[in-house]
């Protein structure tokens, strides 16, 4: 988490005994950071890809004792879905993988980092060659019903590579009042960023948007949304 990033800001606002949902946890680095920043939070970390999940399970066991790792995707409804897994880019795989867009974003990011074209070509060669995997999908509200039926949700972190709207559309109306903060990476294609922020605002969360300097020129943005204090 960068010093100025929204993940760090969200972590700093956690309270002991908060529930944290880490949706798209990958190998668990964010989950570890949340637990380290605020000991006492209960982290529910969710990751659908089997190889990434095995790393997540081990990391949670070693570094997040007050947490649980679940092997599932999260979307608008319960069921199964086909994901495109990128063995060479395990942080970029998705239910809505788009090889052309993913290649463009990676190339732009590396250019912003100062790499020359030869280095970029070497790094990106076949990086988004994918394979199909079938995974179980649940919803935020189903996760809460099964694993955290009560308590305040201090943070919902979302990093799901173009499935951001699916995740928040899977939150039942009765659960929104429990959620204090949402932080998400959002891919702004098809007006997704505006729709995502509008949905959060419709449930009482004030939204902010930023784009990291290294991601300028890509479709990737960060969203920070929090419920205003009641005093």
Task: Set out the residue ranges of the language-model regions.
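Phosphate/nucleotide-binding beta-alpha loop and adjacent structural elements of enzyme active sites
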Residues: 1-231
């Amino acid at each position: 988490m960068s010093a100025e990033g929204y993940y760090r800001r969200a972590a700093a606002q956690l309270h002991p005994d908060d529930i944290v949902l880490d949706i798209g946890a990958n190998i668990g680095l964010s989950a570890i950071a949340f637990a380290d920043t605020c000991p006492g939070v209960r982290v529910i970390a969710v990751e659908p890809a089997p190889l990434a999940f095995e790393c997540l399970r081990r990391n949670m066991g070693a570094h997040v004792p007050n947490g649980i790792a679940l092997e599932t995707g999260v979307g608008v409804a319960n069921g199964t879905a086909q994901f495109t897994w990128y063995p060479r880019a395990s942080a970029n795989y998705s239910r809505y993988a788009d090889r052309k867009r993913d290649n463009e974003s990676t190339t732009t990011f590396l250019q912003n980092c100062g790499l020359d074209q030869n280095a970029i070509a070497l790094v990106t060669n076949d990086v988004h060659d994918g394979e199909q995997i079938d995974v179980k999908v649940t919803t935020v509200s189903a996760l809460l019903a099964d694993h955290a039926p009560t308590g305040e949700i201090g943070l919902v972190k979302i990093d799901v590579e173009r499935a951001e709207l699916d995740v928040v559309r899977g939150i039942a109306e009765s659960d929104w009042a429990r959620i204090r903060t949402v932080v998400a990476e959002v891919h702004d294609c098809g007006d997704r960023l505006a729709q995502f922020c509008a949905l959060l605002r419709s449930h009482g969360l004030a939204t902010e948007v930023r784009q990291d300097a290294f991601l300028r020129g890509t479709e990737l943005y960060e969203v920070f949304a929090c419920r205003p204090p009641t005093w």
